[in-house]
């Protein structure tokens, strides 16, 4: 029997959290039962931070929210039946938000591990509903999350065009993201996050492992960083398509990118304004756009062609990293190549990737999954099936693409089964749907997106 037996653990504990204003280091402490403490640290540059009065209260609220949400990385190792919060208490609204993050954010993890989480995740409610958080007089400035891919770069350029002061922000030590961030020419904020080293040992000892809602964790980190820096906006770049999951026969919808979707954005953003700071806005600038609309926007500038990468193999915590920015075989590479193809010259796209992914017959299976042909949409941050089908149909009508192996196969085997009315590009370019973008800003960026 291994030293860590996930089936024998009864309680996951949120032991304590603290922030050292002199160093900017937040310490998040967890434990299973009476086992050793699991200590994670998050380091926000710019210390020392002067915290007093309402600002200190808001920072404490944000710190506890981060402690609760970041705990998902450790909770999943055993998924025990009980949860305890040792050093503070939470109200029903906080418990509901965090339970939702754990339940839906671990949806793919539960599906892959054959676990049933519904009704199993209960955060203890021991506090009365809190009074509404006050406005703090935060200065107008955006912390913009950058991930190294096309989406955040579209947001950064749209905010630049709209005249919004911004700081390009990321978490962790990715050199690829740093290169992209520096390419923007804007101020940067690189936040450090060090997971408890014991977590990797638990994984070796048979802990449950799998995908977590990392955007939820990063959102909580950036809310804390925004308060420490006294700024009023945290901006992500999640588009409309992120709200749609993979349809699994016998299971229903499982959304790999749930914390990039509208349900999370709405719940988290509303919570922050009610419980943390009334004038701190959390929103995704691209929410009203489809993946294809974002791709069209990105194609308007070649400023980042030699720097960006959406390839997930560059970003796995553990595992191989390709020498090139694009591995060419993962679902993200497949999708981004396909999404950009209708909107830029073929030579430019092939230059970016270093090869033509659509003229390689061995890639057909990967594209079938994107098209939802004989397979479900991959568990990746990729667009809806109809977006992929529409993009492929556009290429099928173009002389420069229609002889390429994957496109040719689409024309022969797949397109005849599809309704041409479902393959129109214009509806996918519509700017529509709910969002949390401040109204005055939305008027400015909407005009830019519509061109």
Swiss-Prot record:
Which pathway is recorded for this entry?
A: Cell wall biogenesis; peptidoglycan biosynthesis
Which InterPro entries does the annotation name? MurL, MurL_epimerase
Would you say which domain of life the source belongs to?
Bacteria
Picking any one GO molecular function of the record gives: racemase and epimerase activity, acting on amino acids and derivatives
Q: What is its EC number?
A: 5.1.1.23
One GO biological process term: cell wall organization
**What reaction(s) does this enzyme catalyze?**
UDP-N-acetyl-alpha-D-muramoyl-L-alanyl-L-glutamate + ATP + H2O = UDP-N-acetyl-alpha-D-muramoyl-L-alanyl-D-glutamate + AMP + diphosphate + H(+)
The enzyme's first-digit EC class, named in words, is isomerase
Keywords for this entry? Cell cycle, Cell division, Cell shape, Cell wall biogenesis/degradation, Isomerase, Peptidoglycan synthesis
Q: Which family does it belong to?
A: Belongs to the MurL family.
Query: What is the stated purpose of this protein?
Result: Cell wall formation. Catalyzes epimerization of the terminal L-glutamate in UDP-N-acetyl-alpha-D-muramoyl-L-alanyl-L-glutamate.
Q: What is this protein called?
A: UDP-N-acetyl-alpha-D-muramoyl-L-alanyl-L-glutamate epimerase
Annotated source species = Xanthomonas oryzae pv. oryzae (strain MAFF 311018)
Name of encoding gene? murL
